[in-house]
Structures are given as C-alpha cells and as structure tokens.
C-alpha cells in the first residue's frame, strides 16, 4: 500500500472524527439518543429506595375523541397514618430520612406484634407478626393487615406508570377511636388531623417535585379545578383531588340527638376546607352525627364502632323498618357486609378457627363501655328492621346546600339509606351533578338516581372476577347516561382487600403491558421482597393495583378494563358539571330557640337556634310567584307577603314562592301559637298540632319539612 495514500486516508478519518465530536457537543442530539433522564424519570431519587419496575413512557394527550385516558381511584387514604392519634396506621407515605424510616412499624408492634391491638379487632387472630419493614417485609404490608402502610409514594408512582390518572386522597380520622386506642403521639381533634393530612399531601407533592428538578416538575399534582386536572392528565401526570372522610366534620357531633354545631360552624368549616383545596367530602362516617345517620358496619368491626358511637353520642345505633327496598347493612355479630360469596365462605372458616380470638376482641369492646352499659342485641330484629332511623337532619340539609354553593362533590356511601334518599332529593331539587359513591357502600337501588343526576360511581376493589361481574351489572345504565366507572381501593382505610388469587389457572404472567400498551410492568421489588399479584394479592399495596387490573383482563374482563381506562374522563365530567351549577333557589330554614320562639329565614340562624326544617324558595321572580318578607316580632320572626311587614320590624326579603302548586312543591302555611305569641311556618295543614293556621303563604320547593 502507498504510505502517502494511507496517511491521507487516516488524516480524513481523523478530521471526520473531530467534526463528529464537535457536532455531538455543539449540535442537537441525534434522534432517539437520550441526553439525560426522560421527563417521567426522577433526576434525584433517594438511595436506597423501592423500585418501580415499569419501563416505557407514560401516555399523554387525549384519545381521538378528545377524551383524557386513565383509570381513577376515587377513594384512598394516603395520609391515614397522620390520623387516629398517629399510631394506628404504621409507616409513612414518604420520609426525608428515606425508605427505612418511612416503612417501619409502630414501636409497640416490636418485637412480635403482640400489642397490635387494632389488627386483632379488625382482622382477628392474635396480631403477632414480624414488625420489620424495610428491607425484608416478611409480614407486611399485607392485604389483610389494617394497620400497615400500603401507599408508599413509589408504589403510588408504579400505579401512575401503570395507567392511573386520577387519585382522590380522602383525609380520614376518628376522634373516638383515637381516644380509645392505647397508643398515640398527638391529640384527637378531628379537624386538626384533617388539616395536617392536607398539609402532608402538599408536602408529598413537593417531595416528588424535588426528585424531578423543582416545583411543578413531578408527576404528583394536587388539583383544585377540573380544567387543571384535565391539563395535568394530558401532560401524562397524576391529578390528585383532596377529599375528607371523618366522623364529626366541623365539630358536628350529636349528643343524645342534640346537635353540637350550628349553621355558622358549617359555613366556616366548608369555607376553610374549600380554601385548603378540598373538593369532595362525606358528611357522616361510622357514627351518627349532627348532620346525618350512617350506614351500619357489620361483624366485630360493627360491634366496635357501635360501642364508639355510644361513647361519642350517648346513643347506640337505632333501627326501624325500611320504607322501601333499600336497606342498611345488618349490625349483628355476623360477617362483614360487602364480601363476595367465596369471601364469606372463607371468612366463615377463618371465624371458626379464630373463635377464641374473636371472643377476646368482643370482650375488649365490651370492656370499653361504662359499667352497667350493654351493647344492644339486634339479631332477632334484623329481618324486620334493618334501617337506621336517623336520616339527614336540617343541619345536614344545610350542609348539602352549602356544598352545592361551593361546587363541592358530596359522597353518600356512608349515609344511611334514609339520609342518602333525602340528600339525593336535595340534589335533585337543585339539579346538581356533584354526587359520588366511591367504594361500594351505597345501596345499589340508588344507582340510576346518581347517574340521572350526572354523578360518578366506583366499585370497591374485590377479587378481579367479582369486580368485573359487579361492573357489568350496571354497564347498561352507564351507557344510557354516559357515565364513567372507576375503582375505590380504600387502601389504608381498614377495608377488606383482595388477597392471593383463588384460581391457580391462567395467572398473571410477568412482564405484562399496561392497558394502553405503552408501558411494561414486571414484578414489583421493594428491598429484598418481590411482590406478585398471583401469590400476594392485588390488595397488598398500591403498586399492585395495575397488576390487579391485569388480573381483570386475563380472567376475561377486557371490556371492564377498557371502561376503567375511560374513568378519568367520567370523573372529570361530573366535576365539571358542578362548576357550571348555579341554583335558582335559596334555602328557607325554620329554627327554634326556647323562650324566644321560631323564625324562618334565608339568612344564617342566630346563635342558640336549632334547625327544624328546610325548604327552597326562588331567589328571583318568576311567573306565578310572590315575594315573602321576614319580619321581627319580639324575639322571633314571621313571614308575610306584605313589604310593610304588617307594621312589624322588617328584616328583609327571603325569596319567592309559587302562588299555585308546581311539581316538587309543598304548601307553606303560617301558623300561630297564641299561648306564647309565637309564629312559625309549616308545610302541614294542621300546623303540627292544636295551633292556629293563619293562612297559606304559597308553595315552596320541598327539601324537608316537619
């Protein structure tokens, strides 16, 4: 070879290499060559930490019809470890000190779980377990342990990567359970705990943001408006909605059926929660309160909650014959309501095996009651009386109307059927879509009423075949009303959750693709523990929810998976409809205070007045209506169509009533009690007793009345 030619070629090769290097350094990156972490990958994840075990880019944008995609979990409790006194749920969603600090058991569970008292009550057995979390996780988290953290942030991240796009984080606590539980590191005020959990949710957002390079860059995005949520989902991130599920919101407890809160307390409480970002909430949970009666719990858990109800309110649950086909859960010491047939059979076998432990739990519950107080026995009357006699109170109706005024969504799952019926009637009168049933606690007879309003329903996280079967039961109704469907995992909420697959055949095979097809999920690994939905169960921790959805698919539920992936759109449409709501009505509230008398007003009731009834009156004039005025008489007030207030002191107009009956209206009479010179309004022609009926004022829209 000619050495000069070889040298010449070498020189050109060298020049080419130099130019290529310059291009790589100064020019744009070659197509497909990553210049660093992708947008969905953190730049600074703590080490060590849980793995996510998902590859592929999260889907973004919309489908061909302009709809967002992704499944919704409308009921989960990320921060329940901050409620109930701080030591009922062990472990945290995140910790600045790392995974070993976040995923560790409560101090009293060491060395062998013998003091895991709440586990004994809710799960039976003796509570013994290996308390060590990171890195071994021998015994927890588990689908059947109510007291160990299930929503570590990296597990939530895996759910997002697996297709979730809406997460409703319900702040939860219970002051009575907190006060009764032996171990706590803080006070038991419910609203203080709710505020802390909201704060921690925002701190989690900042924690994730820091991993991704700064504020706003992370995948965990708290949203307060539906259009904001839609934008977040289109970016491929997780929209997080704040909710509240507590037993005595705003301090609205009842003692011996006497309310301990006022309209002003409700308004202040709703204003505060809305300002903090809360957009959905329950008005009652577990205990009958000043707003509504509850849907009973069953089994040992129901027994414990009924005891707590007495300690909180001085009253046990009280039943009455149901007015229709809808009914509340049975109270007796039997199995928990909500299990599948197979689950009931398994639970029955376990109950027999753990009879001694269950008897011990019952003894502990009875021991919490004052001496001489016994739990009522409901078993003999369950067939004839299975409904809570307590419904939606006048204060509760005011709270429902207050939520519609603030465009918040009402959760009705824990309401008694009487309360749910009354709440739905209020919302129907208002033509308000913001009604939710998010974890399978609503009587299914209300389903069409919820869909007709434009509300949203999710199914509880049962075994995959059972969930699919339940989803299909009302698929035709969803198609009729254009409603979406979702999941309510209720993780960290002491709920029954699915364990290992009952059938060994046709297992979930790893790795598998996410429902959209764009990501690949392998077995999830945390520390030394490898999780598998086939042997551990989808209800073990939050990172296995995508695996459980894959289980739905492989067991013949592709149609259900397809519908779940439209759930985010369905939830947002319900939320969006609340934003466009403007009620033509104002509440007309009847109140009473001893030694003062009655008043009926569209303004907040003064201090000391209790609520007796609520109606709706029109805010603006309409054909066939007349205006009513409130007038002060001594310490009470009367209503009149006379702008001059019949010579009494004017307090202002209350609204317009119809002069003739219209659909949904009730008559409104002015009544008088001569012995105490007291006026009041009623929709009863007999004026509720031997009182004087002074005349018909008009016709108001029914909400509730005496």
Give the ranges of each region predicted by the language model.
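Conserved acidic
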Residues: 391, 395, 408-411
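Short catalytic-loop micro-motif centered on adjacent basic/acidic residues
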Residues: 409-412, 437, 458
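Extracellular glycan-binding segments that recognize GlcNAc-based cell-wall polysaccharides
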Residues: 585-706
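Short acidic catalytic loops
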Residues: 73-74, 405-415
């Amino acid at each position: 070879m000619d050495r000069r030619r070889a040298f010449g070629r070498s020189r050109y090769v060298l020049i080419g290499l130099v130019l290529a290097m310059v291009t790589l350094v100064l020019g744009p990156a070659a197509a497909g060559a990553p210049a660093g972490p992708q947008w969905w990958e953190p730049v600074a994840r703590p080490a060590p930490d849980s793995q996510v075990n998902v590859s592929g880019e999260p889907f973004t944008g919309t489908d061909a019809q302009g709809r967002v995609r992704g499944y919704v979990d409308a009921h989960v409790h990320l921060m329940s470890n901050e409620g109930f006194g701080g030591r009922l749920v062990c472990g945290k969603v995140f910790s600045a000190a790392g995974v070993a600090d976040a995923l560790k058991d409560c101090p009293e569970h060491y060395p062998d779980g013998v003091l895991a008292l709440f586990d004994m009550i809710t799960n039976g057995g003796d509570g013994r377990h290996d308390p060590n979390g990171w890195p071994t996780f021998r015994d927890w988290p588990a689908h059947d342990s109510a007291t160990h953290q299930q929503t570590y942030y990296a597990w939530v991240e895996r759910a997002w990567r697996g297709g979730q796009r809406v997460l409703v984080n319900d702040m939860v606590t219970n002051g009575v359970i907190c006060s009764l539980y032996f171990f706590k590191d803080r006070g038991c005020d419910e609203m203080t705990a709710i505020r802390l959990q909201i704060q921690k949710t925002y701190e989690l957002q900042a924690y994730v943001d820091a991993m991704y390079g700064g504020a706003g860059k992370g995948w965990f995005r708290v949203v307060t408006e539906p259009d904001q949520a839609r934008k977040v989902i289109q970016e491929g991130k997780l929209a997080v909605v704040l909710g509240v599920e507590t037993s005595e919101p705003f301090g609205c407890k009842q003692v011996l059926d006497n309310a301990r809160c006022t309209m002003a307390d409700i308004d202040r409480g709703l204003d505060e929660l809305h300002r903090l970002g809360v957009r959905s909430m329950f008005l009652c949970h577990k205990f009958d309160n000043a707003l509504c009666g509850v849907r009973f719990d069953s089994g040992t858990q129901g027994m414990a909650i009924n005891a707590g109800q007495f300690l909180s309110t001085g009253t046990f649950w009280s039943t009455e014959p149901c007015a229709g086909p809808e009914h509340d859960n049975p109270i007796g010491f039997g199995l928990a309501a909500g299990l599948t047939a197979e689950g009931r059979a398994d639970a029955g076998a376990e109950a027999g095996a753990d009879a001694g432990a269950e008897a011990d739990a019952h003894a502990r519950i009875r021991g919490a009651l004052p001496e001489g107080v016994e739990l009522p026995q409901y078993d003999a009357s369950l067939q004839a009386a299975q409904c809570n006699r307590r419904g939606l109170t006048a204060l509760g109706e005011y709270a429902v109307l207050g939520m519609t005024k603030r465009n918040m969504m009402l959760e009705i799952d824990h309401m008694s059927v009487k309360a749910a019926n009354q709440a739905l009637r209020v919302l129907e009168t208002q033509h308000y879509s913001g009604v939710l049933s998010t974890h399978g606690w609503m009587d299914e007879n209300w389903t069409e009423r919820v869909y007709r309003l434009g509300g949203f329903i999710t199914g509880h996280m049962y075994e995959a075949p059972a969930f699919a079967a339940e989803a299909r039961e009302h698929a035709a109704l969803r198609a009729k009303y254009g409603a979406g469907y979702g999941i309510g995992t209720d993780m960290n909420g002491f709920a029954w959750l699915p364990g290992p697959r009952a059938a060994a055949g046709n297992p979930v095979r790893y790795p598998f693709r996410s429902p959209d097809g764009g990501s690949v999920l392998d077995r999830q690994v945390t520390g030394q523990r490898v999780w598998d939905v086939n042997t551990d169960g989808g209800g073990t921790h939050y990172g296995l929810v995508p695996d459980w959805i894959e289980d739905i698919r492989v067991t013949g539920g592709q149609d259900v998976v397809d519908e779940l992936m439209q759930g985010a759109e369905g939830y947002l449409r319900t939320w969006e409809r609340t934003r466009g709501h403007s009620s033509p009505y104002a509440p007309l509230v009847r109140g009473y205070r001893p030694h003062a008398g009655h008043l009926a007003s569209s303004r907040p009731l003064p201090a000391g007045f209790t609520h007796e009834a609520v109606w709706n009156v029109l805010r603006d004039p309409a054909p066939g209506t007349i205006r009513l005025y409130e007038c002060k008489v001594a310490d009470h007030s009367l209503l009149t169509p006379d702008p001059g207030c019949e010579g009494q002191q004017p307090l202002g107009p209350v609204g317009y009533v119809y002069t003739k009956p219209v659909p949904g209206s009730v008559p409104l009479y002015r009544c008088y009690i001569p012995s105490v010179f007291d006026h009041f309004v009623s929709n009863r022609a007999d004026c509720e007793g031997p009182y004087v009926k002074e005349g018909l004022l008009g016709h108001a829209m029914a909400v509730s009345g005496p």
